[in-house]
Amino acid sequence: MKFLLTSNENFKDYFAALVNRSNGDMSAVMPAVSQILEDVRAKGDEALFEQIEKFDRWKPDANSLKIGTDEMQKAYDGIDSCLRNALNLAFERIKSYHEKSLPKTWMEHDEHGVLLGAKYTPLDRAGLYIPGGKAAYPSSLLMNAVPALVAGVGEIVVCTPAVGGKVNTLLLAAMHICGIKEAYKVGGASAVAAMAYGTQTIKKTDVITGPGNIYVATAKKLVYGEVNIDMIAGPSEICVIADESADPRHIAVDLLSQAEHDEMASAVLITPNQAFGAAVQRHINEEIKTLARQPIAQVSIDKKGAIIVASDLDECVRLANELAPEHLEIATNDAMELARQIRHAGAIFIGHFTPEAMGDYLAGPNHTLPTGGSARFYSPLGVENFMKRTSLISLNAKGISELGNACMKLADAEGLGAHKRSVAVRLEALK
């Protein structure tokens, strides 16, 4: 794990590389992903079944591809009651939060009597990609399905890989909680292709959301425009601003909570106190030995971990804004004041009792967040990803009489005669 002072001679170069990180090099997988997409687009189910047999090692058909609601119910009934209660609590909290962010259709008349407005409409069909196998996270299903449900999407389809034809039990239970009626055992770029183009079994969707590996991210990038997507997600990342008021063990474990996700995950502490930074590093070395995913976390910490000692909290904030992290924790006595100064972060976790893990599961806000610095221009997944906005315009005689001449001047200046004429004939009719 790198330990750097901002006053170090090589700090600027190191931090510039950190800021300019990407969501992964897609060039190596682009040819293979492009071929998968083209095969599914051209051959539909035939290609889909071939790819599932190749990658997931089971032989599907149109019937076995679909996950039945009875499977979801059975999984839900069979899990531990405490876990069932936790999933239901998470569902309710995520639902409550997203209901508060529903955009509302509006209309109003301006001073010329022109009626203007915006109409928000849920999409007809949404495709949710949810990783499976060892990386099967029911929380990802909740975080993608709930905003689609709240938005009022007509049809929601889930695709998840099923190695050997088996789907993770907790994932099935989460599907039941969300009331999912349509789900398929297909993963990777194949699933993205099916949802983007449609096959004989899986209908085309209007949007594809959800996390995935580099193959899924590349596929989503390539089908964008054919359908909408949420974002191109890369490895998980956390940045923590903390000072001596924080418990160094707490901060160490918070950093490891992202490092255990992925060998490419990044965990960065920015602190104005060098002794505190050293204490956090000692606790990381102790705590990492206790993790079941210690080998993954160790690679992440060694390759992508950093403790940065800044001159003061103002510099900590400046560096965090430049980094634009997916997750930003602020563990200082004046955490709320520092949070007000943050412009670029996927989610901000404020105060000593707000570990990032609470946001991952059941605080309420979405855990699908922009990575790789894209928090500068992307927002977390929300109901807006499952809706579209349509402009509303209605002029009466008064409105076109008062605004028509200006409109004709602009049309004339752009050399668009029919535009000008469409206004002129109406003005003439009013004389």
Could you say what each language-model-derived stretch is?
Residues 179-266:
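Conserved NAD(P)+-binding/catalytic subdomain of aldehyde/semialdehyde dehydrogenases
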Residues 108-173:
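Conserved small-residue-rich beta-alpha loop and adjacent elements
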Residues 154-163, 267-273, 280:
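Short internal beta-strands
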Residues 261, 269-345:
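A glycine- and small/hydrophobic-rich beta-loop-beta segment
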Residues 322-431:
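C-terminal core of ALDH-fold dehydrogenases
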Residues 143-154, 176-178, 196-203, 220-222, ...:
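Alpha-helix C-terminal capping segments
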Residues 1-124:
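N-terminal Rossmann-like NAD(P)+-binding subdomain of aldehyde/semialdehyde dehydrogenases
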